[in-house]
């Protein structure tokens, strides 16, 4: 299946490094971007979540990765960046394009891409200021395993409408958990 043009453009731009540096007022811009993405995810709802209660699943969101006091700003930004990349990948699958309205999906890609761009610019500034490891390997693994469980769930449920609705609601929940980044 051919990828939507906006997805291809986002992938091309993602592969290029930003030559300009954005101001790192991340908590404000990140919050606004999250609000836009959450609104889009809300608009993507096609069926009532109540009709899918039998399909509920605990994907084991690694909340400890996003607890603000545990990490310094670069590690928190890196964790959120990995999460957004995984969400982008999840909604870029063939099964996803068949499940959602293409216009809303394109807007979601754009919103996620904007988030990634802001995080990358901010991360490069933060790492330049202090030489700290970007993300604890255990945290990175926890985020990736979480999304692997979601992908496996979708596969086991044969990408059914209810499975996608459960995943959409889960992504909204986990995405909103990552909105509060440390200020320093």
Curated annotation (Swiss-Prot):
Q: Which CDD domains match?
A: IFab (cd00095)
Q: Which UniProt keywords apply?
A: Antiviral defense, Cytokine, Disulfide bond, Secreted, Signal
Q: Is the Iron keyword given for this protein? A: no
Q: Its principal location?
A: secreted
One annotated Gene Ontology cellular component of this protein: extracellular space
- Carries keyword Signal? yes
Localisation per UniProt entry: Secreted
Family designation: Belongs to the alpha/beta interferon family.
Q: Which organism is it from?
A: Equus caballus
Give an example GO molecular function. Answer: cytokine activity
Q: PROSITE patterns per the record?
A: INTERFERON_A_B_D
- InterPro entries, per database record: 4_helix_cytokine-like_core, Interferon_alpha/beta/delta
Q: Domain of life here?
A: Eukaryota
UniProt-listed GO biological process terms: adaptive immune response; B cell activation involved in immune response; defense response to virus; humoral immune response; natural killer cell activation involved in immune response; response to exogenous dsRNA; T cell activation involved in immune response; type I interferon-mediated signaling pathway
| Role description | Produced by macrophages, IFN-alpha have antiviral activities. Interferon stimulates the production of two enzymes: a protein kinase and an oligoadenylate synthetase.
Please name every pair of cysteines joined by a disulfide bond in this record.
24-122, 52-162
In Swiss-Prot or TrEMBL terms, this protein is called Interferon alpha-3
Q: Which residues form the signal peptide?
A: 1-23
